[in-house]
Amino acid sequence: MLSSAKHQRNHRLSATNKNQTLTKVSSISSSSPSSSSSSSSTSSSSPLPSQDSQAQKRSLVTMEEVWNDINLASIHHLNRHSPHPQHNHEPRFRGQNHHNQNPNSIFQDFLKGSLNQEPAPTSQTTGSAPNGDSTTVTVLYSSPFPPPATVLSLNSGAGFEFLDNQDPLVTSNSNLHTHHHLSNAHAFNTSFEALVPSSSFGKKRGQDSNEGSGNRRHKRMIKNRESAARSRARKQAYTNELELEVAHLQAENARLKRQQDQLKMAAAIQQPKKNTLQRSSTAPF
Protein backbone atom coordinates (compact mmCIF):
# COMPACT_ATOMS: atom_id res chain seq x y z
CA MET A 1 0.00 0.00 0.00
CA LEU A 2 2.81 2.44 0.82
CA SER A 3 4.57 1.74 -2.46
CA SER A 4 1.32 2.29 -4.42
CA ALA A 5 0.69 5.57 -2.57
CA LYS A 6 4.24 6.71 -3.33
CA HIS A 7 3.76 5.72 -6.93
CA GLN A 8 0.52 7.74 -7.23
CA ARG A 9 2.09 10.76 -5.53
CA ASN A 10 5.09 10.71 -7.86
CA HIS A 11 2.76 10.35 -10.82
CA ARG A 12 0.78 13.41 -9.71
CA LEU A 13 3.96 15.45 -9.26
CA SER A 14 5.16 14.55 -12.74
CA ALA A 15 1.72 15.39 -14.15
CA THR A 16 1.79 18.83 -12.50
CA ASN A 17 5.28 19.47 -13.88
CA LYS A 18 4.10 18.53 -17.34
CA ASN A 19 1.06 20.80 -17.04
CA GLN A 20 3.31 23.72 -16.07
CA THR A 21 5.56 23.15 -19.06
CA LEU A 22 2.52 22.86 -21.33
CA THR A 23 1.20 26.20 -20.13
CA LYS A 24 4.59 27.79 -20.77
CA VAL A 25 4.77 26.35 -24.27
CA SER A 26 1.20 27.40 -25.08
CA SER A 27 1.93 30.91 -23.82
CA ILE A 28 4.95 31.07 -26.13
CA SER A 29 2.94 29.82 -29.09
CA SER A 30 0.11 32.29 -28.39
CA SER A 31 2.46 35.20 -27.83
CA SER A 32 4.38 34.75 -31.11
CA PRO A 33 1.42 35.39 -33.48
CA SER A 34 0.10 38.16 -31.22
CA SER A 35 3.47 39.92 -31.35
CA SER A 36 3.54 39.69 -35.16
CA SER A 37 0.00 41.08 -35.42
CA SER A 38 0.81 43.88 -32.98
CA SER A 39 3.90 44.86 -35.01
CA SER A 40 1.80 45.04 -38.18
CA SER A 41 -0.90 47.10 -36.48
CA THR A 42 1.50 49.68 -35.02
CA SER A 43 2.26 51.03 -38.49
CA SER A 44 -1.39 52.01 -39.01
CA SER A 45 -2.58 52.70 -35.47
CA SER A 46 -1.33 54.13 -32.20
CA PRO A 47 1.10 52.07 -29.94
CA LEU A 48 -0.30 49.68 -27.32
CA PRO A 49 -0.40 50.68 -23.64
CA SER A 50 2.68 50.10 -21.56
CA GLN A 51 0.84 47.79 -19.13
CA ASP A 52 -0.01 45.28 -21.88
CA SER A 53 3.57 45.29 -23.13
CA GLN A 54 4.91 44.72 -19.61
CA ALA A 55 2.47 41.82 -19.04
CA GLN A 56 3.49 40.33 -22.38
CA LYS A 57 7.16 40.61 -21.46
CA ARG A 58 6.47 38.91 -18.14
CA SER A 59 4.66 36.04 -19.93
CA LEU A 60 7.56 35.48 -22.35
CA VAL A 61 9.97 32.71 -21.38
CA THR A 62 13.26 31.89 -23.03
CA MET A 63 13.57 28.72 -25.09
CA GLU A 64 16.37 27.33 -22.92
CA GLU A 65 14.16 27.47 -19.80
CA VAL A 66 11.38 25.64 -21.62
CA TRP A 67 13.82 22.94 -22.77
CA ASN A 68 15.25 22.50 -19.28
CA ASP A 69 11.80 22.23 -17.66
CA ILE A 70 10.57 19.70 -20.23
CA ASN A 71 13.76 17.67 -19.99
CA LEU A 72 13.73 17.48 -16.18
CA ALA A 73 10.02 16.61 -16.00
CA SER A 74 10.32 13.88 -18.62
CA ILE A 75 13.41 12.32 -17.06
CA HIS A 76 11.77 12.36 -13.61
CA HIS A 77 8.65 10.69 -14.97
CA LEU A 78 10.59 7.99 -16.84
CA ASN A 79 12.87 7.19 -13.90
CA ARG A 80 9.92 6.91 -11.49
CA HIS A 81 7.42 5.00 -13.60
CA SER A 82 9.42 2.99 -16.14
CA PRO A 83 8.79 -0.78 -15.62
CA HIS A 84 12.23 -1.56 -17.09
CA PRO A 85 14.77 0.89 -15.65
CA GLN A 86 17.65 -0.70 -17.56
CA HIS A 87 16.35 0.82 -20.81
CA ASN A 88 17.36 4.47 -20.73
CA HIS A 89 14.72 6.08 -22.94
CA GLU A 90 15.32 9.71 -23.66
CA PRO A 91 12.42 12.20 -23.52
CA ARG A 92 10.97 12.94 -26.87
CA PHE A 93 8.11 14.65 -28.72
CA ARG A 94 6.12 12.82 -31.32
CA GLY A 95 4.00 14.70 -33.81
CA GLN A 96 1.42 12.28 -35.18
CA ASN A 97 -0.61 14.51 -37.44
CA HIS A 98 2.25 16.22 -39.23
CA HIS A 99 0.64 15.49 -42.61
CA ASN A 100 -2.24 17.79 -41.76
CA GLN A 101 -0.09 20.60 -40.34
CA ASN A 102 0.20 23.97 -41.95
CA PRO A 103 3.57 24.32 -43.77
CA ASN A 104 3.84 27.87 -42.34
CA SER A 105 3.46 26.73 -38.72
CA ILE A 106 6.23 27.44 -36.24
CA PHE A 107 7.95 25.16 -33.75
CA GLN A 108 5.69 26.23 -30.87
CA ASP A 109 2.61 25.18 -32.87
CA PHE A 110 4.28 21.85 -33.56
CA LEU A 111 4.86 21.32 -29.83
CA LYS A 112 1.33 22.40 -29.01
CA GLY A 113 -0.18 20.01 -31.54
CA SER A 114 1.94 17.09 -30.38
CA LEU A 115 1.02 17.61 -26.73
CA ASN A 116 -2.73 17.78 -27.38
CA GLN A 117 -2.95 14.16 -28.52
CA GLU A 118 -5.27 11.85 -26.62
CA PRO A 119 -3.86 8.94 -24.60
CA ALA A 120 -4.42 5.50 -26.10
CA PRO A 121 -6.90 3.25 -24.25
CA THR A 122 -5.50 0.33 -22.33
CA SER A 123 -7.09 -2.94 -21.36
CA GLN A 124 -6.04 -5.78 -19.12
CA THR A 125 -6.32 -9.39 -20.21
CA THR A 126 -5.92 -12.30 -17.84
CA GLY A 127 -4.53 -15.54 -19.25
CA SER A 128 -3.87 -18.87 -17.58
CA ALA A 129 -0.72 -20.85 -18.23
CA PRO A 130 -0.81 -24.70 -18.48
CA ASN A 131 0.72 -24.98 -15.02
CA GLY A 132 -2.26 -23.14 -13.47
CA ASP A 133 -0.65 -19.73 -12.92
CA SER A 134 -2.68 -16.76 -14.09
CA THR A 135 -0.92 -13.92 -15.87
CA THR A 136 -2.29 -10.40 -16.29
CA VAL A 137 -1.10 -8.58 -19.40
CA THR A 138 -1.75 -4.91 -20.13
CA VAL A 139 -2.43 -4.33 -23.83
CA LEU A 140 -2.05 -0.89 -25.36
CA TYR A 141 -4.35 -0.29 -28.32
CA SER A 142 -3.37 2.28 -30.86
CA SER A 143 -4.08 3.03 -34.49
CA PRO A 144 -3.16 0.12 -36.82
CA PHE A 145 -1.13 2.34 -39.16
CA PRO A 146 0.36 5.23 -37.16
CA PRO A 147 1.82 8.03 -39.28
CA PRO A 148 5.58 8.55 -39.12
CA ALA A 149 6.63 10.68 -36.19
CA THR A 150 9.38 13.23 -35.77
CA VAL A 151 11.57 12.38 -32.79
CA LEU A 152 13.83 14.96 -31.16
CA SER A 153 16.29 14.68 -28.29
CA LEU A 154 15.86 17.13 -25.42
CA ASN A 155 19.16 16.39 -23.63
CA SER A 156 21.19 18.57 -25.99
CA GLY A 157 20.57 22.28 -25.43
CA ALA A 158 20.41 23.83 -28.90
CA GLY A 159 21.07 20.78 -31.13
CA PHE A 160 18.65 18.00 -32.06
CA GLU A 161 19.37 14.35 -32.73
CA PHE A 162 17.19 11.77 -34.41
CA LEU A 163 16.27 8.90 -32.15
CA ASP A 164 14.38 5.67 -32.56
CA ASN A 165 10.62 6.24 -32.65
CA GLN A 166 9.77 3.64 -30.05
CA ASP A 167 7.44 4.54 -27.23
CA PRO A 168 8.44 3.32 -23.74
CA LEU A 169 4.88 2.14 -23.08
CA VAL A 170 4.81 0.15 -26.32
CA THR A 171 8.26 -1.29 -25.53
CA SER A 172 7.19 -2.38 -22.06
CA ASN A 173 4.00 -3.85 -23.53
CA SER A 174 5.98 -5.87 -26.08
CA ASN A 175 8.30 -7.08 -23.30
CA LEU A 176 5.27 -8.25 -21.31
CA HIS A 177 3.90 -10.10 -24.35
CA THR A 178 7.27 -11.76 -24.98
CA HIS A 179 7.56 -12.84 -21.35
CA HIS A 180 4.03 -14.26 -21.47
CA HIS A 181 4.73 -16.28 -24.63
CA LEU A 182 8.02 -17.58 -23.22
CA SER A 183 6.31 -18.70 -20.01
CA ASN A 184 3.62 -20.51 -22.03
CA ALA A 185 6.25 -22.27 -24.18
CA HIS A 186 8.24 -23.30 -21.09
CA ALA A 187 5.11 -24.68 -19.41
CA PHE A 188 4.21 -26.64 -22.56
CA ASN A 189 7.70 -28.13 -22.77
CA THR A 190 7.69 -29.16 -19.11
CA SER A 191 4.26 -30.79 -19.41
CA PHE A 192 5.36 -32.69 -22.53
CA GLU A 193 8.51 -33.90 -20.80
CA ALA A 194 6.44 -34.98 -17.80
CA LEU A 195 4.10 -37.03 -20.03
CA VAL A 196 6.84 -38.79 -22.02
CA PRO A 197 9.65 -40.36 -19.96
CA SER A 198 13.15 -39.48 -21.00
CA SER A 199 14.41 -43.07 -20.63
CA SER A 200 12.43 -44.20 -23.70
CA PHE A 201 14.25 -41.63 -25.85
CA GLY A 202 17.61 -42.87 -24.54
CA LYS A 203 16.74 -46.53 -25.17
CA LYS A 204 15.52 -45.82 -28.68
CA ARG A 205 18.63 -43.81 -29.46
CA GLY A 206 20.83 -46.62 -28.10
CA GLN A 207 18.97 -49.25 -30.13
CA ASP A 208 19.28 -47.17 -33.29
CA SER A 209 23.00 -46.69 -32.74
CA ASN A 210 23.52 -50.42 -32.11
CA GLU A 211 21.55 -51.35 -35.22
CA GLY A 212 23.48 -48.86 -37.32
CA SER A 213 26.86 -50.15 -36.07
CA GLY A 214 25.78 -53.77 -36.70
CA ASN A 215 24.69 -52.97 -40.25
CA ARG A 216 27.96 -51.19 -40.95
CA ARG A 217 29.98 -54.11 -39.55
CA HIS A 218 28.02 -56.61 -41.68
CA LYS A 219 28.51 -54.56 -44.84
CA ARG A 220 32.23 -54.20 -44.13
CA MET A 221 32.54 -57.97 -43.62
CA ILE A 222 30.75 -58.67 -46.92
CA LYS A 223 33.03 -56.25 -48.76
CA ASN A 224 36.12 -57.88 -47.23
CA ARG A 225 34.94 -61.32 -48.30
CA GLU A 226 34.23 -60.15 -51.82
CA SER A 227 37.65 -58.53 -52.13
CA ALA A 228 39.35 -61.70 -50.81
CA ALA A 229 37.46 -63.85 -53.32
CA ARG A 230 38.46 -61.54 -56.16
CA SER A 231 42.12 -61.67 -55.11
CA ARG A 232 42.02 -65.49 -54.90
CA ALA A 233 40.45 -65.68 -58.37
CA ARG A 234 43.12 -63.42 -59.82
CA LYS A 235 45.89 -65.51 -58.20
CA GLN A 236 44.38 -68.76 -59.48
CA ALA A 237 44.08 -67.39 -63.00
CA TYR A 238 47.70 -66.27 -62.96
CA THR A 239 48.84 -69.67 -61.69
CA ASN A 240 46.89 -71.49 -64.40
CA GLU A 241 48.35 -69.21 -67.04
CA LEU A 242 51.89 -69.93 -65.83
CA GLU A 243 51.27 -73.67 -65.75
CA LEU A 244 49.94 -73.63 -69.32
CA GLU A 245 52.96 -71.65 -70.49
CA VAL A 246 55.39 -74.07 -68.79
CA ALA A 247 53.67 -77.06 -70.40
CA HIS A 248 53.82 -75.41 -73.80
CA LEU A 249 57.55 -74.64 -73.38
CA GLN A 250 58.32 -78.19 -72.27
CA ALA A 251 56.55 -79.63 -75.31
CA GLU A 252 58.41 -77.25 -77.60
CA ASN A 253 61.73 -78.23 -76.02
CA ALA A 254 61.06 -81.94 -76.56
CA ARG A 255 60.14 -81.38 -80.18
CA LEU A 256 63.30 -79.38 -80.81
CA LYS A 257 65.46 -82.11 -79.22
CA ARG A 258 63.95 -84.80 -81.43
CA GLN A 259 64.48 -82.66 -84.49
CA GLN A 260 68.13 -82.15 -83.58
CA ASP A 261 68.68 -85.89 -83.19
CA GLN A 262 67.16 -86.56 -86.58
CA LEU A 263 69.41 -84.01 -88.22
CA LYS A 264 72.51 -85.57 -86.65
CA MET A 265 71.56 -89.05 -87.87
CA ALA A 266 70.93 -87.83 -91.41
CA ALA A 267 74.30 -86.06 -91.52
CA ALA A 268 76.12 -89.21 -90.36
CA ILE A 269 74.54 -91.36 -93.03
CA GLN A 270 75.33 -88.99 -95.86
CA GLN A 271 79.05 -88.52 -94.92
CA PRO A 272 81.41 -91.04 -96.83
CA LYS A 273 83.86 -93.35 -95.05
CA LYS A 274 87.43 -92.03 -94.95
CA ASN A 275 90.53 -94.11 -95.75
CA THR A 276 92.91 -94.29 -92.85
CA LEU A 277 96.31 -95.90 -92.25
CA GLN A 278 96.36 -98.48 -89.55
CA ARG A 279 99.39 -100.07 -87.89
CA SER A 280 99.37 -103.77 -88.18
CA SER A 281 101.91 -104.61 -85.48
CA THR A 282 104.19 -102.88 -83.17
CA ALA A 283 107.85 -103.53 -82.83
CA PRO A 284 109.19 -104.23 -79.39
CA PHE A 285 111.92 -101.78 -78.63
UniProtKB/Swiss-Prot annotation:
Protein name: Protein FD
Domain of life: Eukaryota
Pfam families, per the entry: bZIP_1 (PF00170)
Bias kind Basic residues: ranges: 1-12
Annotated localization: Nucleus
Region (Basic motif): 216-235
Post-translational modification, as annotated: Phosphorylated at Thr-282 in a calcium-dependent manner by CPK6 and CPK33.
Binding partners and assembly: Self-interacts. Interacts with FT and FDP/BZIP27. Interacts with GRF3 and GRF4, and in a calcium-independent manner, with CPK6 and CPK33.
Record lineage: Eukaryota, Viridiplantae, Streptophyta, Embryophyta, Tracheophyta
Compositional bias per record (Low complexity), positions renumbered to this chain: 26-50
Expression sites (tissue/organ): Highly expressed in shoot apex.
Ranges where the bZIP domain occurs: 214-277
Annotated segments matching region Disordered: 1-59, 79-107, 115-134, 198-236, 257-285
Matches recorded under PROSITE patterns: BZIP, BZIP_BASIC
